[in-house]
């Protein structure tokens, strides 16, 4: 087996999309290295803390490309694999996420089949207690500061709203209990949407809503989702 550098898009949502990919590569290789924006490092390293042969290297795309270039001379890794731009075809009818997995040489079903994160229930409970939702509540995530705001008229007014405000935690997985216990989930297309869709939990009465109008995306980059979402365009 070999040592490989795997580069994919570095958004936190992209890390969730490629969780299954990374885990499959760690089965196939002796050593795997991936990259993470420093701001996402806590979440990414937490998500993969159960994999001993994975190295998460903090750095942006420019750092990652330079690291991969320098590896040609240092030969610390036997192989490099880039499954993101410039290898994606935005004019292809194949969705972006499927292209990721095809470029990685993996069945797209591995996105869900191989997804895994070891939850820390004590951390989740600490955040749940800190936010103290009472009764039925809505978990809502948007980004009004960037102009990606959910129209509150499209959200039921008879429930409290809980949102992941900045400064609460630097680990997205601390929100898992708040997510799974919510009466409704209202999201823009973001890392939280991917977390909700990929996270295995049981709440059959929970309503899932994506407010797509708040963050429109090209058709080729629309998410591939498994759960029963209502989409508001």
Where are these regions (language model features)?
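Catalytic machinery of carbohydrate-active enzymes
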Residues: 1-233
